Amino acid sequence: MFKIQLSVTSFILGVLCVACSKEEAGHGHSGSDETNSEPYIPVEVISNAHTVTYLEPRTYIIEEPQSSQGNVCYLILGEERAVMFDTGAGENTMVDGTRMRYVIDQITDLPVTLFMSHFHFDHNQNIAEFDHVAFIELEYLVEGTSSEGVYEFSDTELVFGSYPASVQVNEWWPLDTDIDLGGRSIRVVSIPGHTDESAMIVDTQNKLMFMGDYIYDGPLYVFGQQNLIPYETTVDMLIANYDDSFSVYGAHGSPQVPHENLQKLKDILVCIQEGECIPSMTNIWGYVVQRYNLNGMEVWVFLE
């Protein structure tokens, strides 16, 4: 896997390049398809609010360096459909009436399904720009959805604010089952710890893991001491099933996370549970927070 940093030259040249690249992309295949005689050509994206980087194969890292949360989202392309992993913090100025969709529309004409890593406010603020939304198929989420397919977000799930109040769920993605995008398959895996609904997208063929807020470049947030146990259970599963041939990508800060950080996370969680790590105390957003640090890995536990 490698990255190609997309640079923006002038608006006119960029628009011409986008038009050409989108046409070619419509006939291209995943970089993992050896039968393809016309390799996929990455699109140059114009945006004053985003840094867009191409990741082989057919994946775009969409960073929001100007957002207060430093969000990172991912657009994952197949041949027949695309997946938007998270929607962004929604703090940038609209372009053509949208904050994220105008970026996507420069890249692809494929139908796009939104799948959120979890429901916190900084991952769902552009949710209204998507007309097809998939949820991870967890029993309590299915039971909490109305007969019309509407899911209402709680204040706890959002953390801050009251938007979005609800969303229409169009598709349920079962755990550990291939989701066919056309020439490329992904899986959704439950990774509780940061939140109960936390999920990652795994491209097993291309060895890519998109992990949301479970692990990223920065202090990891645990909301309540009771979530330390599921956090540790999840990291045990990850270490056992995804070796260092997989590349790890998070939802904040620098997109790629060293795979070895999974073991560092395991070490600090054990240290906390065994009472060997001593926290410093602070207040954040009105919460009392225990801040732990071990070997460069930080875990902040928000006390309820």
PLM features: residue spans?
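Hydrophobic/aromatic beta-strand patches that form the interior of the parallel beta-sheet core
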Residues: Y60, T113-F115, A134, E171-W173, ...
